[in-house]
């Protein structure tokens, strides 16, 4: 389980994964040994949300409340804070390089703290709010790829930041929805970025990897390279679009099309081809 700094607490907390077809809630707690203990979980049909965005506040907040309540019953515990994972919010990754002068030529801890806090006023896309800020490697004068410049000599120290931001409107609406469930919004995370942390190795993120999270109503993507998040985005098409296309082409119900897709469908061309067509008998009158 990936836990952000805002989740680093001894109190139980919830993680709500918002999909187009279902909501999933996990309740966890950090143990005295610094492990993450899973206490409870629950799923519920998604309502009032489409393609990662809230379309009906009342229906969505009700569905969230039912999902969290079921997870609380499963865990036999009550939570006050929830962290959201969603493909929505029109995510954007921006990169900034911050540079400071080194007055005494030797880099101190104060210099490192100074450059780390210098990113608080960096610009974001219009109408966006920052949800993640990741520092990269340092540069000291013309020397690049420095992991820890403490004690080194130089005149200027630079540090690149990768910032992930989402629409302020989406953020505010998610916060409003959980507040209606008497919960506090701890943080919001992009689904593909969280999938990268869960699925990719350190080598994957260092060498360069594109991860595609194919959901029901959206397809989320994230790119890591040299250990840094380079891109995150969401396409408002997913598995439900494929299901509807099958239903239209074969004149069958959505449930029949979903079953056919699950049994016969494949994204690998080596498994299916024109030489091995799928047969389907239409049984309805």
Model-derived segments and their meaning:
Residues 23-27, 220-223:
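Short beta-strand scaffold segments in enzyme catalytic cores
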Residues 1-20, 26-210, 228-230, 239, ...:
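Nucleotide/phosphate-binding catalytic cleft detector across ATP-hydrolyzing
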Residues 207-245:
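Glycine-rich phosphate-binding loop of actin/hexokinase-like ATP-binding domains
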Residues 247-251:
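Long, well-ordered mid-to-C-terminal structural blocks that present hydrophobic/aromatic surfaces
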């Amino acid at each position: 389980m990936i836990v952000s700094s805002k989740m680093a607490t001894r109190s139980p907390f919830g993680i709500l994964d918002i999909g187009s077809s279902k909501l999933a809630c996990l309740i966890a707690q950090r143990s005295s040994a610094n492990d993450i203990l899973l206490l409870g979980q629950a799923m519920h049909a998604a309502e009032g949300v489409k393609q990662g965005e809230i379309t009906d506040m009342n229906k969505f907040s009700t569905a969230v409340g039912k999902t969290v309540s079921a997870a609380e019953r499963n865990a036999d515990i009550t939570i006050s804070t929830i962290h959201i994972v969603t493909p929505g919010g029109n995510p954007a990754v921006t990169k900034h390089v911050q540079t400071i002068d080194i007055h005494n030529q030797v880099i101190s801890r104060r210099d490192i703290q100074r450059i780390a806090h210098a990113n608080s006023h960096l610009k974001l896309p219009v109408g966006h709010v920052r949800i993640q800020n990741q520092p990269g490697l340092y540069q000291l004068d013309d020397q690049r790829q420095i992991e820890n410049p403490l004690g080194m000599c130089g005149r200027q120290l630079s540090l690149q930041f990768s910032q992930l931001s989402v629409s302020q409107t989406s953020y505010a609406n998610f916060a409003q929805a959980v507040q209606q469930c008497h919960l506090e919004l701890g943080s919001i995370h992009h689904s593909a970025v969280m999938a990268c942390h869960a699925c990719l190795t350190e080598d994957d993120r260092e060498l360069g990897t594109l991860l595609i999270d194919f959901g029901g109503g959206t397809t989320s993507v994230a790119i890591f390279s040299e250990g840094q998040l380079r891109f995150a985005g969401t396409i408002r098409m997913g598995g439900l679009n494929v299901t509807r296309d099958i239903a239209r082409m074969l004149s069958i119900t959505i449930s029949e099309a979903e079953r056919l897709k699950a049994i016969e469908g494949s994204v690998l061309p080596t498994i299916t081809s024109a030489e091995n067509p799928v047969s389907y008998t239409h049984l309805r009158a």
